[in-house]
Amino acid sequence: MIRPFALVPMLALCLVASAAAAADPIDSAWPEVARAQDGDCELSVTGNGRFYRIAASGLGADAAGRFFLSNGDMKPLDWSIRAAGDGGFTRYYLPFRWHRDGGEVLVAVESARCSVSTTFAWKRVEVVVH
């Protein structure tokens, strides 16, 4: 015999999982700060003033590639990457630099199919606690 109260936690879990799946990603309303295109490939950078989302598309399904990012005099990132099954690649970036109020970030993504790059400016945002 099934106890009615045993179903309550299971039902609650289903409702929470459904609500979480329906929620928009936290970055869905971030404005675009930079964009580049090469044929079917696109590179888009969106941000909220502190965090930035770097997204490339059209690289080719599961394609090998390179991701390059530089920010002032920091040692640049130069990574081997693999695109997702849909040909996309996404990373988040926090452009904080000690003793710097801002700067310019260069981002480049390439695969055998294309090469896209763009730059965007960042500025340190003061945190105001109310």
Predicted segment positions?
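Extracytoplasmic/secretory-pathway segments with low complexity and glycosylation-like composition
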Residues: 21-130
